[in-house]
Design a protein with these regions (language model features):
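Internal acidic/polar
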Residues: 23-25, 112-135
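N-terminal module of bacterial RNA polymerase sigma factors
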Residues: 1-51, 58, 147, 198
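A short pre-motif secondary-structure segment
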Residues: 156-160
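DNA-recognition helix of helix-turn-helix
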Residues: 4, 103, 142, 153, ...
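Structural recognition of an alpha-helix C-terminal capping motif at a helix-to-coil junction
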Residues: 54, 68-75, 88-100
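Residues within helix-turn-helix
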Residues: 64, 168, 179
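Arg/Lys-rich amphipathic alpha helix in sigma70-family domain 2
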Residues: 83-85, 96-116, 193
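Sigma70-family region 2
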Residues: 61, 74-89, 109-110
Length: 198
């Protein structure tokens, strides 16, 4: 079984956020206007909270940590909405904030565990204890393999295979070139395949 079929089997669902581009653009316009921002913000949270939670949860595994990070993401969105220039989609901008928050959280976690335990091992333990996976052995092995990847590589892998984002979308979110992404994804896929064959 190859990685693509395992990922598909895992049930990676991309939420159809951008199903109505005009609606998204009008929401962005309402958020930029100081007078309508307070009314529009709950719509933004309603639209993006679930998919942002999915991305964050795949990175930090723990439900409680994911909830905290998602809350921080939307606080940052609220405080920085004036900085949204519309050069990318609202989706991309919010996902960039979310992925940066995840990477920062994991970096801090590693720094706190200096000389001590392995963060990947801790996440693997949470994978089992936090009911992240609904029991299937293949899914569990895949998730453990993904946890062996460096954080940014794991993020790219998750965005590509589970969120089913295009290379261009991932490049915009991670501020990386498409060529670098493809190379990173190739290495990640090879590492995961090796882990699954053990």
């Amino acid at each position: 079984m190859d990685i693509k079929s395992v990922c598909f089997f895992f049930g990676g669902i991309r939420f159809l956020i951008l199903n109505n581009v005009q609606e998204t653009e009008s929401l962005a316009a309402l958020l930029k206007d100081v007078q309508t921002r307070r009314e529009a913000f709950p719509d933004l949270v309603k639209r993006y909270q679930r998919p942002v939670y999915g991305v964050v949860r795949k990175m930090v595994i723990s439900h409680d940590d994911a909830d905290d990070i998602v809350q921080d993401v939307f606080v940052k969105v609220w405080h920085n909405i004036d900085k949204f220039k519309g050069e990318s989609s609202l989706f991309t901008w919010i996902y960039r904030i979310a992925t940066n928050e995840c990477l920062q959280f994991l970096r801090k976690k590693r720094n706190r565990q200096w000389l001590g335990g392995d963060v990947s091992e801790e996440l693997a333990e949470k994978l089992v204890s936090d009911n992240f996976i609904d029991g299937d052995e293949v899914q569990m092995k895949l998730q453990k393999a993904i946890l062996t990847l460096p954080d940014k590589q794991r993020l790219v892998f998750n965005l590509r295979y589970f969120e089913e984002l295009s290379y261009e979308e991932i490049a915009a979110i991670t501020d990386t070139s498409v060529g670098s992404l493809k190379a990173s994804l190739h290495h990640a896929t090879r590492k995961i395949e090796e882990f699954l064959q053990e």
